[in-house]
Amino acid sequence: IQQDFDAKWYSDPQLRTNETFVLDAVENGCSPFKAEIAWYLREKSVPKPEYKAEIQKLKNISKKNLAGVITTNYDTFFEKLFDDYTPYIGQDQLVFSSIQGIAEIYKIHGSVTVPDSLVINEQDYETFNEKGKYLAAKLMTIFMEYPIIYIGYSLNDSDIQNILKDILLCLPNDKIERLQERLCNV
């Protein structure tokens, strides 16, 4: 899909949004497909009013009990909700940064703020999976120190399963039990 979209985007100017954000991203080497998706999600992602109370509860919990957020979502919901948290975008930023494990957001599939970071096509997922062991090693240090709460997606998600599998392969049985006690799925 991305290759077809990119070819059409270059050949048909009417397909382009002509937003500076998109044009700058493409000029810097980003795929038009990723740039347009990032722009669209930036513009259209708005919290639903019917979730206002739940969002406020999550914000209140974070002030006392939430060390960090790990998400596969591209949008900026968590950055806006927890504006004092530091976001780490993509595996490279997470793996090669000196993280503290407190007040941080780990956007493992990228972010709309960095369109080229989006894990969205087959090649992106292959690269993501190839580097999965490095990500798992970094996350393991966080998981062993802090409780883990999964919000919004199932533990049946293949990306989550792969990360957990990679972590479990590195741990002795007593540490696996400790990790299991720290997992909570909402």
Language model features with spans:
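Conserved catalytic-core helix/loop/strand module for nucleotide-ribose chemistry
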Residues: 1-122, 131-146, 155-186
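Short helix/strand-bridging catalytic loops that position acidic/His residues to coordinate divalent metals
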Residues: 128
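Active-site loops and adjacent core secondary-structure elements that bind or stabilize anionic groups
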Residues: 152
